[in-house]
């Protein structure tokens, strides 16, 4: 596990962003192996979010029998008035398996409405089954026929940053 506080990546560097006709979707992994590579401020923000919502995450995971769920922050942004969204249809593919959302911890009131005004955003922490290869480059995110394979580029950036984080931490330990 990389040490926290030595990363330089921004949230946009690890977020997957794609559009359907009505929506812009942003998917951000909350796995510690990934967020520890963020800049200290961004890491603090993401780890703080997980900490603040820990009880709700744990309760949702327990309700669905998931001892160690994979967490993502997911945002749906309305590109037109009354844009419908169905978060249950946001699937992730990894190592030949498809993962559907198991549970949701809403972060905005719009999440439960399943419809967005133009320029409105619905955000939640989405729980998936464990078993995704987040450090591999084969993660595919799909929603209603649209998908992105941009994770391949993110995975390369994560690998470079992981090496740099360990080097920076080692150098800091020698001072």
Question: Residues of each region from the PLM?
Answer:
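Conserved functional micro-motifs across diverse proteins
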Residues: 1-175
